[in-house]
Every structure is written in structure tokens, then in C-alpha cells.
């Protein structure tokens, strides 16, 4: 379990030292992710609003009337007649059938909810990609600063040795100047690296929610596919980009049915009870009661082209959404391909850079020994030292790029999510919020009217949605530090 969230400026008992801690904290407290979850609740309400089409409405009204009506009577008889009336009533309306319009609206709203959940998954993947990026950026820059500091120490020793040789006439003033110049350059590079580390720490704080400490090495990402074909297969099923496009098309398809249903007849019951009488002087016994009940059947014949226009617009939107599925599919293929290629090249760079570091270290150590006995010049030593440092820096960058690329592959597949990456974290389940409002203001006869109205519209097949179970082999490999459970 990860620690409770606090404001960035608030003191904390412990810092997120591992990648699992960082992911858990960002998953729980990142404002962008929290805002997206709140937005999803707005979409949930669209389903409730759609169902309201087959639920009763109750309205009340109260009127008061005062009127003076002129008379034709001669004076001194009254020249006007005063009338004051009051009335109050309650009207109850219940739609029994509206040609499948409400059933289609419910199907469209359900698909919109599911599409919004896929949008939330996309946001989560984006945030976690930023967390991984920020984490390994800090780790990279910490290692670079360490290499630069070590480089400064080595060059300081080299300058001392060169000066000692100069004192006894073994080297010239030029050798001393070369060592001094290299040391000055190393100081400047260290300052630059420290500045970059501060920038990376600020980025980490922004996305995770707290300042980084000395971060632990990142673990191997879980669930990495063995081949690019496996990555494509997973993305075809689990990519939120593709899933959202499909859900959006389902919604617009249901809206076509809803638009067509506007031309069908509707049946409603309406009942009214009211009282009316003289306001002044008020006498309850003078008020008469009126009770009416009626069945209303409505069949549109002509709407000025409104319904036809709505149908054409809905059809055009559904066509666009069906085309967008292919666009989303191509986007996913591109993302997986690019991420896989980047990962493959980065891993290859790690292998070659490791060999380069090994060879450069042997060369540097040999050059140092040969310099001590006069077989190498100061410049030879400085060049060998610079070659070794460049190789070490290249290896650090290669490790960084490979890990970011691996996270990119998981993101393109649709598996860069907390449920796949970490254990012991209370996962956000969007279905929980939806279930709370799904049957809000429900009535015992809702199911009967739903089935009756559905007879007027073709069914749009949709999945149940919700959080999918972890696939086999997708057990999270990381666990954040223990802490109090999420509220």
C-alpha cells in the first residue's frame, strides 16, 4: 500500500525512493489523472439522463387571477364586474413508449461511458509514461553528476602529477596548460550537469508530487512481449486508443437509431388533479376539484425537415466514427512499431556501449601507467581519460533510453497501467461510480418500460465494460513502500 497523499509543500515522513513508490503516488494524487476521473463521473450522468425519458414527471402549478370586466349598466349601477379566481393542481406524466428513442439513448450513453473509461486509461498511461521518464531522467542525471565529479577528481590528480613532472623538467609548460584547461572544462561540465539534474528533479516533483531522493535502480518492466508480433496482438485487444474509437462508433450508431425513432409514435399517460375557486373572500367550501386522466398518442408527420436533418447528421457522424476506427488502428500500429524499433536500437546501444566502456577503461589505465614511465604524453592521458568518460556517459544515456523505450512499448500495447505495474495499490474502479448513479431515481416498472421501448429500436450490442482482469503472465513486478491505505 502506498502512503497517503499530501500537498507538495507539506512535510512527508518518507520520500518515494523506488519507481513503484513514484508510480503509486502519481496514480493516486496526480491532478491531471484526478481531473480525468472527475470528468468521467460527468459522463456517467449521461446514462441517468437518458433513462429519464421513460420515467414519470410530476409538476405543480398555482395561479391567481384578478380581473375587472366593464359592464353596460347605467349609473349609478356598477360600471364593472370584479372577478378573482385561484387554482392549484398537480400533473403526472408517464411515457410508456417512444418508438425506441430512450432505449437507443441509453445504448448511446453506455457506449459514451465506456469510451470515456478508455480515455481515462489513455490519460493514466500518459501520466505513468511521464513518471517513468521523470524517474529515469533523475537517475540518469544523478549518475552523470557522479561521473563528472569523478572526472574532476581524476583530472585534479592528473594536474598535480603534471605539475610535479614540470618541476623536475620531465614535461613542458604546455603539458601543464593542457591539464589545467581540461580541468576547467570538467568544472564547467559538472556545473551544467548539476543544473540539468535540478531541472529533472523539478519535472519529477511536478508529475509525482514530491521531490526525489536518491532513487533506487529501476526494475525490469513486467509483461514485456518477446516479439513485436506479440506486441501487436496485445495492442489489438487492449490499446485504449483503438478501444475508445470503437466505443465512440457504437455511441454514434445508437444515436442514428435515436434520430430515426423521433419519427415513430409515442404513447404517454397523463393525470391531473386540481382545485379552483374564489380567492377573496376565501372559502374552502367554494373550491371545486377537477380530476382528469388521458392517454396521449403522438405521431409526427412533418417537422419542417428537423428530424430528417438529424438523421442525416447522425449517419454522417457514424460514418466518420467508423473511418476513425481505421485511423486509430493505424495510429496504434505506428506507435507499437516506433516504440519497438526505439527499444531495439536502445538495447543494442547498451551492448555496444558496455563494450566501449570496457575497452576505454583498459586503454586509459594503460596510458596512465605508460605516462608514469615517460612513454605517453600528458595529451595522450587526457584524451584517454576523455574517451573513457564519454563512453561512460553514453552507456548511462543508453540505459536511460532503453528503459524509456520499454515503457513506450507497454504504453503502445495498452499495458502501461498501475494494475499491470505495481501491487499493493488500491486501484480506481470507474464502474463503482457508475453503479452508484446507474439506478438513481429508479422505479419498479423501469425494466418493463425499457423492454417495451426497446421493441421499437434495433439493439446495439455492447460489452459490459469495467476493469478487465489481469491476463496471464501480467503479474505486476513492482511494489511500492508500505503505507496507509487510500481513503
Model-derived segments and spans:
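Periplasmic alpha-helical coiled-coil/stalk elements that build and connect Gram-negative outer-membrane
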Residues: 126-236, 248, 342, 346, ...
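Residues that define the transmembrane beta-barrel architecture of outer-membrane proteins
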Residues: 84-86, 287-291
Amino acid at each position: 500500500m502506498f502512503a497517503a497523499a499530501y500537498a507538495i509543500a507539506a512535510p512527508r515522513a518518507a520520500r518515494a525512493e523506488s519507481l513503484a513508490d513514484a508510480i503509486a503516488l502519481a496514480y493516486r494524487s496526480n491532478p491531471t489523472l484526478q481531473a480525468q476521473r472527475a470528468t468521467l463521473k460527468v459522463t456517467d450522468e449521461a446514462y441517468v439522463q437518458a433513462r429519464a425519458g421513460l420515467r414519470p414527471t410530476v409538476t405543480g402549478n398555482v395561479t391567481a387571477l384578478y380581473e375587472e370586466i366593464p359592464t353596460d349598466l347605467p349609473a349609478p349601477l356598477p360600471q364593472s364586474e370584479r372577478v378573482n379566481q385561484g387554482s392549484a393542481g398537480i400533473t403526472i406524466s408517464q411515457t410508456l413508449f417512444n418508438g425506441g428513442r430512450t432505449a437507443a439513448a441509453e445504448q448511446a450513453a453506455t457506449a459514451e461511458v465506456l469510451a470515456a473509461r478508455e480515455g481515462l486509461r489513455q490519460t493514466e498511461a500518459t501520466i505513468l509514461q511521464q513518471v517513468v521518464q521523470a524517474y529515469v531522467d533523475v537517475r540518469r542525471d544523478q549518475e552523470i553528476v557522479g561521473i563528472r565529479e569523478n572526472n574532476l577528481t581524476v583530472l585534479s590528480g592528473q594536474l598535480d602529477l603534471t605539475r610535479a613532472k614540470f618541476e623536475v623538467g620531465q614535461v613542458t609548460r604546455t603539458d601543464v596548460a593542457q591539464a589545467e584547461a581540461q580541468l576547467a572544462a570538467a568544472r564547467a561540465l559538472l556545473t551544467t550537469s548539476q543544473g540539468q539534474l535540478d531541472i529533472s528533479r523539478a519535472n519529477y516533483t511536478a508529475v509525482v508530487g514530491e521531490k526525489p531522493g536518491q532513487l533506487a535502480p529501476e526494475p525490469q518492466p513486467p509483461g514485456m512481449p518477446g516479439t513485436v508480433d506479440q506486441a501487436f496482438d496485445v495492442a489489438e485487444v487492449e490499446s485504449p486508443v483503438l478501444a475508445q474509437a470503437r466505443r465512440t462508433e457504437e455511441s454514434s450508431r445508437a444515436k442514428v437509431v435515436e434520430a430515426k425513432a423521433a419519427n415513430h409514435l409515442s404513447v404517454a399517460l397523463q393525470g391531473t388533479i386540481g382545485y379552483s375557486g374564489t380567492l377573496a373572500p376565501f372559502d374552502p367550501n367554494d373550491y371545486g376539484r377537477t380530476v382528469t386522466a388521458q392517454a396521449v398518442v403522438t405521431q409526427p408527420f412533418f417537422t419542417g425537415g428537423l428530424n430528417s436533418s438529424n438523421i442525416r447528421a447522425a449517419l454522417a457522424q457514424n460514418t466518420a466514427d467508423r473511418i476513425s476506427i481505421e485511423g486509430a488502428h493505424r495510429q496504434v500500429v505506428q506507435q507499437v512499431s516506433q516504440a519497438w524499433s526505439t527499444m531495439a536500437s536502445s538495447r543494442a546501444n547498451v551492448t555496444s556501449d558496455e563494450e566501449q566502456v570496457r575497452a576505454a577503461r583498459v586503454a586509459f589505465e594503460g596510458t596512465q601507467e605508460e605516462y608514469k614511465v615517460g612513454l605517453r604524453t600528458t595529451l595522450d592521458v587526457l584524451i584517454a581519460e576523455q574517451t573513457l568518460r564519454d563512453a561512460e556517459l553514453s552507456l548511462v544515456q543508453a540505459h536511460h533510453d532503453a528503459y524509456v523505450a520499454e515503457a513506450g512499448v507497454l504504453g503502445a500495447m495498452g499495458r502501461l497501467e498501475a494494475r499491470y505495474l505495481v501491487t499493493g495499490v488500491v486501484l480506481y474502479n470507474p464502474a463503482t461510480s457508475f453503479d452508484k448513479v446507474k439506478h438513481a431515481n429508479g422505479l419498479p416498472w423501469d425494466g418493463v418500460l425499457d423492454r417495451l421501448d426497446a421493441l421499437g429500436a434495433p439493439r446495439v450490442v455492447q460489452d459490459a465494460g469495467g476493469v478487465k482482469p489481469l491476463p496471464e503472465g501480467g503479474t505486476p513486478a513492482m511494489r511500492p513502500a508500505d503505507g496507509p491505505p487510500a481513503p
